[in-house]
C-alpha cells in the first residue's frame, strides 16, 4: 500500500478520551490500511497474556511507522444492542517507529525495499472474543493526529523534519508476518 503522511485515520469528531473505544470501521477499507479478518467464531476465544505482532515488511523510504490493532468485530445483527451491529472494537494496539526496530538506544534508517522484522509489542491483555464475533487485525503506517506524522525519511530528529523531508512511501507486509497471542483454553466456552 502507498502511504502519504497526511490524512487522519480516525474521525474528525474524535476526542482524546474516546479514541480507544472508537469504531475502527473508519479505517477499514482505506487503501493505506491492511485488514485481516477471521470467519465468525464457532466458540468463544479468550486471549490472556502478552500480544506481539511480528511484521516482515519493507518500506521504500528510510523510516516508517508500523501500527497494529487487534479488533473485536461484532456481528452485523447484534440483538443485545442493535447500534453495536458490525462495530469494530479495538482490543489492543501499539505503534513501532521503524527506526527503533533494533532497540530504542540504536535508531537506524531502513534500507529501502529491504525486508526487516518489525516487532510491535501490543502489551498484555485478557479479553474474550465471543462466539459469532470475528477477530480482525489492521496494519497501517499513520495514526495522525493521535501519533505525530513520520516523514518516511530517516532524519536525526523527527520533530525538526522540514516540509522537504516528507515523502510518499510504499509499505509492503509479507506473508511470513504473524500475530502472537496466547489463547486461554481453560476459559473456552462452547
Listing of model-derived features with the role each one plays in the protein:
Residues 1-190:
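C-terminal, loop-rich substrate-recognition/catalytic regions characterized by aromatic stacking residues
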Amino acid at each position: 500500500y502507498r502511504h502519504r503522511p497526511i490524512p487522519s485515520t480516525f474521525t474528525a469528531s474524535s476526542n482524546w478520551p474516546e479514541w480507544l473505544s472508537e469504531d475502527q470501521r473508519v479505517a477499514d477499507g482505506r487503501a493505506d490500511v491492511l485488514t485481516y479478518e477471521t470467519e465468525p467464531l464457532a466458540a468463544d476465544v479468550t486471549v490472556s497474556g502478552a500480544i506481539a505482532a511480528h511484521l516482515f515488511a519493507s518500506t521504500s523510504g528510510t523510516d516508517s511507522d508500523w501500527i497494529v490493532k487487534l479488533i473485536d468485530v461484532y456481528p452485523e445483527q447484534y440483538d443485545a444492542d442493535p447500534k453495536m451491529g458490525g462495530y469494530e472494537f479495538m482490543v489492543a494496539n501499539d505503534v513501532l517507529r521503524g527506526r527503533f526496530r533494533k532497540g530504542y538506544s540504536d535508531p537506524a534508517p531502513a534500507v529501502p525495499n529491504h525486508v526487516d522484522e518489525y516487532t510491535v509489542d501490543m502489551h498484555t491483555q485478557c479479553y474474550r472474543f465471543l462466539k459469532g464475533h470475528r477477530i480482525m487485525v489492521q496494519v497501517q503506517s499513520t495514526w495522525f493526529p493521535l501519533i505525530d506524522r513520520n516523514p518516511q525519511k530517516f532524519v536525526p530528529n523527527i520533530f525538526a523534519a522540514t516540509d522537504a523531508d516528507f515523502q510518499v512511501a510504499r509499505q509492503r507486509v509479507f506473508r511470513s508476518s504473524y500475530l502472537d497471542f496466547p489463547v486461554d483454553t481453560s476459559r473456552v466456552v462452547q
